[in-house]
Amino acid sequence: MAVNDSVNILNSAYLAVEYIDSFLPDNPLQQPFKNAWNYMLDNYTKFQIATWGSLLVHEASYFLLCVPGFIFQFIPYMQKYKIQPDKPETWEKQWKCFKTLIFNHFFIQLPLICGTYYFTEYFNIPYEWEEMPRWYVLLAQCFGCAVIEDAWHYFLHRLLHHKRIYKYIHKVHHEFVSPFGMQAEYAHPLETLILGAGFFIGIVVFCNHVVLLWAWVICRLMETIDVHSGYDIPLNPLHLVPFYAGARFHDFHHMNFIGNYASTFTWWDRIFGTDSQFIAYKEKEKKQQLRMKKTN
Protein backbone atom coordinates (compact mmCIF):
# COMPACT_ATOMS: atom_id res chain seq x y z
CA MET A 1 0.00 0.00 0.00
CA ALA A 2 2.80 2.39 0.97
CA VAL A 3 4.63 1.57 -2.26
CA ASN A 4 1.53 2.35 -4.33
CA ASP A 5 1.10 5.66 -2.49
CA SER A 6 4.73 6.58 -3.20
CA VAL A 7 4.32 5.74 -6.88
CA ASN A 8 1.14 7.81 -7.08
CA ILE A 9 2.90 10.78 -5.46
CA LEU A 10 5.80 10.55 -7.91
CA ASN A 11 3.43 10.25 -10.87
CA SER A 12 1.48 13.28 -9.67
CA ALA A 13 4.68 15.28 -9.23
CA TYR A 14 5.83 14.30 -12.73
CA LEU A 15 2.48 15.31 -14.26
CA ALA A 16 2.55 18.61 -12.36
CA VAL A 17 6.01 19.46 -13.70
CA GLU A 18 4.94 18.48 -17.23
CA TYR A 19 1.89 20.74 -16.92
CA ILE A 20 4.03 23.70 -15.80
CA ASP A 21 6.57 22.96 -18.54
CA SER A 22 3.83 23.19 -21.18
CA PHE A 23 3.36 26.87 -20.32
CA LEU A 24 7.05 27.74 -20.51
CA PRO A 25 8.35 29.37 -23.72
CA ASP A 26 10.27 27.21 -26.18
CA ASN A 27 13.96 26.92 -25.42
CA PRO A 28 15.78 28.78 -28.24
CA LEU A 29 18.82 26.52 -27.74
CA GLN A 30 16.87 23.29 -28.19
CA GLN A 31 16.91 23.20 -32.00
CA PRO A 32 20.66 24.00 -32.36
CA PHE A 33 21.40 21.39 -29.67
CA LYS A 34 19.21 18.85 -31.49
CA ASN A 35 20.98 19.56 -34.79
CA ALA A 36 24.41 19.22 -33.17
CA TRP A 37 23.38 15.99 -31.41
CA ASN A 38 22.04 14.41 -34.61
CA TYR A 39 25.15 15.53 -36.50
CA MET A 40 27.27 13.77 -33.89
CA LEU A 41 25.20 10.57 -34.22
CA ASP A 42 25.44 10.66 -38.03
CA ASN A 43 29.20 11.23 -38.19
CA TYR A 44 30.65 9.29 -35.27
CA THR A 45 30.30 5.75 -33.99
CA LYS A 46 28.86 5.00 -30.57
CA PHE A 47 32.32 3.94 -29.42
CA GLN A 48 33.79 7.30 -30.47
CA ILE A 49 30.94 9.22 -28.82
CA ALA A 50 31.10 7.25 -25.57
CA THR A 51 34.90 7.31 -25.35
CA TRP A 52 36.19 10.55 -26.83
CA GLY A 53 32.98 12.44 -26.13
CA SER A 54 33.14 11.49 -22.44
CA LEU A 55 36.83 12.40 -22.27
CA LEU A 56 36.16 15.78 -23.89
CA VAL A 57 33.25 16.52 -21.53
CA HIS A 58 35.35 15.61 -18.50
CA GLU A 59 38.52 17.49 -19.45
CA ALA A 60 36.76 20.62 -20.77
CA SER A 61 34.42 20.79 -17.77
CA TYR A 62 37.17 20.19 -15.23
CA PHE A 63 39.62 22.83 -16.39
CA LEU A 64 36.98 25.41 -17.35
CA LEU A 65 35.38 25.11 -13.91
CA CYS A 66 38.83 25.57 -12.34
CA VAL A 67 39.38 28.89 -14.13
CA PRO A 68 37.39 31.18 -11.76
CA GLY A 69 39.20 29.91 -8.66
CA PHE A 70 42.55 30.25 -10.44
CA ILE A 71 41.76 33.87 -11.36
CA PHE A 72 40.55 34.74 -7.83
CA GLN A 73 44.09 34.47 -6.44
CA PHE A 74 45.09 37.49 -8.53
CA ILE A 75 42.12 39.66 -7.48
CA PRO A 76 42.70 41.43 -4.13
CA TYR A 77 38.95 41.99 -3.65
CA MET A 78 38.30 38.22 -3.64
CA GLN A 79 40.74 37.57 -0.81
CA LYS A 80 38.12 38.51 1.78
CA TYR A 81 36.19 35.42 0.67
CA LYS A 82 39.18 33.08 1.00
CA ILE A 83 38.51 30.68 3.85
CA GLN A 84 42.18 30.30 4.87
CA PRO A 85 43.72 33.64 3.82
CA ASP A 86 46.99 32.87 5.61
CA LYS A 87 47.64 29.93 3.25
CA PRO A 88 47.70 31.29 -0.32
CA GLU A 89 48.21 29.08 -3.37
CA THR A 90 51.78 28.87 -4.65
CA TRP A 91 52.98 28.23 -8.20
CA GLU A 92 55.01 25.27 -6.94
CA LYS A 93 51.94 23.59 -5.41
CA GLN A 94 49.74 24.32 -8.40
CA TRP A 95 52.31 22.95 -10.85
CA LYS A 96 52.74 19.78 -8.77
CA CYS A 97 48.96 19.40 -8.66
CA PHE A 98 48.63 19.91 -12.42
CA LYS A 99 51.25 17.25 -13.25
CA THR A 100 49.55 14.69 -10.99
CA LEU A 101 46.17 15.53 -12.52
CA ILE A 102 47.42 14.95 -16.06
CA PHE A 103 48.85 11.58 -15.02
CA ASN A 104 45.62 10.53 -13.26
CA HIS A 105 43.38 11.76 -16.07
CA PHE A 106 45.21 9.98 -18.88
CA PHE A 107 46.66 6.90 -17.17
CA ILE A 108 43.92 6.10 -14.63
CA GLN A 109 40.69 7.73 -15.80
CA LEU A 110 41.12 7.40 -19.57
CA PRO A 111 41.33 3.57 -19.45
CA LEU A 112 38.11 3.63 -17.41
CA ILE A 113 36.49 6.03 -19.87
CA CYS A 114 37.41 3.63 -22.69
CA GLY A 115 35.01 1.18 -21.07
CA THR A 116 32.09 3.63 -21.30
CA TYR A 117 30.88 2.25 -24.63
CA TYR A 118 30.74 -1.32 -23.28
CA PHE A 119 29.01 0.01 -20.15
CA THR A 120 26.28 1.69 -22.24
CA GLU A 121 25.90 -1.39 -24.44
CA TYR A 122 25.63 -3.78 -21.48
CA PHE A 123 22.91 -1.69 -19.82
CA ASN A 124 21.21 -0.84 -23.16
CA ILE A 125 21.60 2.90 -22.62
CA PRO A 126 20.30 4.76 -25.71
CA TYR A 127 22.00 7.60 -27.61
CA GLU A 128 19.12 8.73 -29.86
CA TRP A 129 17.65 12.23 -29.61
CA GLU A 130 14.10 10.84 -29.41
CA GLU A 131 15.02 8.90 -26.25
CA MET A 132 16.54 11.89 -24.48
CA PRO A 133 14.85 12.71 -21.13
CA ARG A 134 13.20 16.06 -20.46
CA TRP A 135 15.26 18.68 -18.59
CA TYR A 136 13.41 18.20 -15.27
CA VAL A 137 13.85 14.42 -15.43
CA LEU A 138 17.56 14.90 -16.14
CA LEU A 139 17.83 17.31 -13.21
CA ALA A 140 16.08 14.88 -10.86
CA GLN A 141 18.31 12.02 -12.04
CA CYS A 142 21.46 14.07 -11.40
CA PHE A 143 20.19 14.84 -7.90
CA GLY A 144 19.53 11.12 -7.34
CA CYS A 145 23.06 10.31 -8.53
CA ALA A 146 24.43 12.92 -6.11
CA VAL A 147 22.52 11.39 -3.17
CA ILE A 148 23.88 7.91 -3.95
CA GLU A 149 27.45 9.11 -4.59
CA ASP A 150 27.38 11.15 -1.37
CA ALA A 151 26.51 8.07 0.70
CA TRP A 152 29.27 6.02 -0.95
CA HIS A 153 31.76 8.85 -0.53
CA TYR A 154 30.96 9.38 3.15
CA PHE A 155 31.56 5.80 4.26
CA LEU A 156 34.51 5.02 1.97
CA HIS A 157 36.14 8.40 2.63
CA ARG A 158 35.79 7.81 6.36
CA LEU A 159 37.37 4.37 5.91
CA LEU A 160 40.32 5.92 4.05
CA HIS A 161 40.97 8.02 7.15
CA HIS A 162 41.51 4.90 9.26
CA LYS A 163 44.93 5.14 10.89
CA ARG A 164 46.11 1.83 9.39
CA ILE A 165 45.57 2.86 5.75
CA TYR A 166 45.46 6.68 5.72
CA LYS A 167 49.18 7.17 5.09
CA TYR A 168 49.19 4.76 2.13
CA ILE A 169 46.35 6.26 0.08
CA HIS A 170 44.36 9.28 1.27
CA LYS A 171 47.35 11.20 2.63
CA VAL A 172 48.16 12.26 -0.95
CA HIS A 173 44.91 14.23 -1.24
CA HIS A 174 45.61 15.92 2.10
CA GLU A 175 48.98 17.31 1.05
CA PHE A 176 47.20 20.65 0.66
CA VAL A 177 45.83 21.89 4.01
CA SER A 178 44.22 24.81 2.20
CA PRO A 179 42.58 23.36 -0.92
CA PHE A 180 42.11 25.03 -4.30
CA GLY A 181 39.79 24.08 -7.17
CA MET A 182 42.29 22.25 -9.36
CA GLN A 183 43.14 20.01 -6.41
CA ALA A 184 39.67 18.39 -6.45
CA GLU A 185 40.93 15.27 -8.29
CA TYR A 186 44.47 15.35 -6.88
CA ALA A 187 44.62 11.90 -5.32
CA HIS A 188 46.36 8.55 -5.13
CA PRO A 189 45.36 6.32 -8.10
CA LEU A 190 43.73 3.84 -5.71
CA GLU A 191 41.64 6.61 -4.18
CA THR A 192 40.54 7.66 -7.66
CA LEU A 193 39.26 4.11 -8.21
CA ILE A 194 37.75 3.60 -4.74
CA LEU A 195 35.87 6.88 -4.37
CA GLY A 196 35.24 7.15 -8.11
CA ALA A 197 33.24 3.92 -8.06
CA GLY A 198 30.44 5.80 -6.32
CA PHE A 199 30.03 7.95 -9.42
CA PHE A 200 28.81 4.98 -11.48
CA ILE A 201 26.29 3.54 -9.01
CA GLY A 202 23.76 6.28 -9.69
CA ILE A 203 24.30 5.86 -13.43
CA VAL A 204 23.41 2.16 -13.15
CA VAL A 205 20.27 3.03 -11.14
CA PHE A 206 18.99 6.03 -13.11
CA CYS A 207 20.62 6.17 -16.52
CA ASN A 208 18.16 5.98 -19.43
CA HIS A 209 20.29 7.99 -21.89
CA VAL A 210 23.97 8.71 -22.47
CA VAL A 211 23.27 12.42 -21.94
CA LEU A 212 22.73 11.70 -18.22
CA LEU A 213 26.27 10.34 -18.02
CA TRP A 214 27.64 13.62 -19.35
CA ALA A 215 25.26 15.80 -17.31
CA TRP A 216 26.24 13.93 -14.15
CA VAL A 217 29.95 14.36 -14.97
CA ILE A 218 29.43 18.14 -15.22
CA CYS A 219 27.32 18.31 -12.02
CA ARG A 220 29.78 16.21 -10.01
CA LEU A 221 32.78 18.24 -11.20
CA MET A 222 30.96 21.50 -10.50
CA GLU A 223 30.32 20.34 -6.92
CA THR A 224 33.75 18.92 -6.13
CA ILE A 225 35.63 21.91 -7.61
CA ASP A 226 33.37 24.27 -5.67
CA VAL A 227 33.96 22.57 -2.30
CA HIS A 228 37.72 22.48 -2.96
CA SER A 229 37.86 26.08 -4.23
CA GLY A 230 38.99 27.55 -0.91
CA TYR A 231 36.56 30.45 -1.38
CA ASP A 232 33.17 30.93 0.28
CA ILE A 233 31.54 33.11 -2.37
CA PRO A 234 28.22 34.84 -1.54
CA LEU A 235 25.27 34.26 -3.87
CA ASN A 236 26.73 30.92 -4.95
CA PRO A 237 23.80 29.21 -6.76
CA LEU A 238 24.88 25.81 -5.42
CA HIS A 239 23.90 27.02 -1.95
CA LEU A 240 20.28 26.78 -3.13
CA VAL A 241 20.62 22.97 -3.20
CA PRO A 242 19.03 21.55 0.00
CA PHE A 243 21.58 20.40 2.60
CA TYR A 244 24.49 21.37 0.34
CA ALA A 245 27.80 21.20 2.23
CA GLY A 246 29.79 23.82 0.34
CA ALA A 247 33.38 25.06 0.41
CA ARG A 248 33.52 26.10 4.08
CA PHE A 249 32.32 22.66 5.19
CA HIS A 250 34.90 20.73 3.15
CA ASP A 251 37.68 23.27 3.72
CA PHE A 252 37.42 22.49 7.44
CA HIS A 253 37.99 18.81 6.63
CA HIS A 254 41.30 19.67 4.93
CA MET A 255 42.27 22.00 7.76
CA ASN A 256 41.26 19.64 10.59
CA PHE A 257 41.68 16.18 8.92
CA ILE A 258 38.84 14.80 11.09
CA GLY A 259 35.10 15.02 10.37
CA ASN A 260 33.04 16.42 7.49
CA TYR A 261 33.57 13.31 5.36
CA ALA A 262 30.63 13.69 2.96
CA SER A 263 31.16 15.02 -0.53
CA THR A 264 27.97 16.95 -1.27
CA PHE A 265 25.41 16.95 1.53
CA THR A 266 25.59 17.43 5.30
CA TRP A 267 23.15 14.80 6.54
CA TRP A 268 25.52 11.82 6.97
CA ASP A 269 27.95 13.86 9.07
CA ARG A 270 25.00 15.18 11.10
CA ILE A 271 23.54 11.68 11.65
CA PHE A 272 26.86 10.16 12.80
CA GLY A 273 28.08 13.26 14.65
CA THR A 274 31.21 13.64 12.54
CA ASP A 275 30.49 17.34 12.10
CA SER A 276 30.73 18.09 15.85
CA GLN A 277 34.20 19.66 15.61
CA PHE A 278 33.07 21.80 12.68
CA ILE A 279 30.03 23.03 14.63
CA ALA A 280 32.27 23.87 17.61
CA TYR A 281 34.67 25.68 15.28
CA LYS A 282 31.84 27.77 13.81
CA GLU A 283 30.61 28.70 17.29
CA LYS A 284 34.13 29.77 18.24
CA GLU A 285 34.34 31.89 15.07
CA LYS A 286 31.02 33.59 15.88
CA LYS A 287 32.19 34.47 19.40
CA GLN A 288 35.43 35.92 18.04
CA GLN A 289 33.52 38.03 15.52
CA LEU A 290 31.20 39.33 18.26
CA ARG A 291 34.19 40.27 20.45
CA MET A 292 35.79 42.09 17.51
CA LYS A 293 32.58 44.05 16.89
CA LYS A 294 32.39 45.08 20.54
CA THR A 295 36.01 46.27 20.59
CA ASN A 296 35.44 48.29 17.42
From Swiss-Prot:
Its EC number is 1.14.18.9. PANTHER family: STEROL DESATURASE (PTHR11863). Its cofactor is Fe cation. The keyword Iron applies. It is found in: Endoplasmic reticulum membrane. A motif (Histidine box-3) lies at residues 249-255. A motif (Histidine box-2) lies at residues 170-174. The keyword Lipid biosynthesis applies. It catalyses: 4,4-dimethyl-5alpha-cholest-7-en-3beta-ol + 6 Fe(II)-[cytochrome b5] + 3 O2 + 5 H(+) = 4alpha-carboxy-4beta-methyl-5alpha-cholest-7-ene-3beta-ol + 6 Fe(III)-[cytochrome b5] + 4 H2O. Signal peptide: none annotated. It is a multi-pass membrane protein. Residues 145-274 form the Fatty acid hydroxylase domain. It comes from the Eukaryota. The chain crosses the membrane at residues 55-75, 100-120, 199-219. One of its GO terms (molecular function) is iron ion binding. It is an enzyme of class 1 (oxidoreductase). The gene is MSMO1. This is Methylsterol monooxygenase 1. Keywords: Endoplasmic reticulum, Iron, Lipid biosynthesis, Lipid metabolism, Membrane, NAD, Oxidoreductase, Steroid biosynthesis, Steroid metabolism, Sterol biosynthesis, Sterol metabolism, Transmembrane, Transmembrane helix. It comes from Gallus gallus.
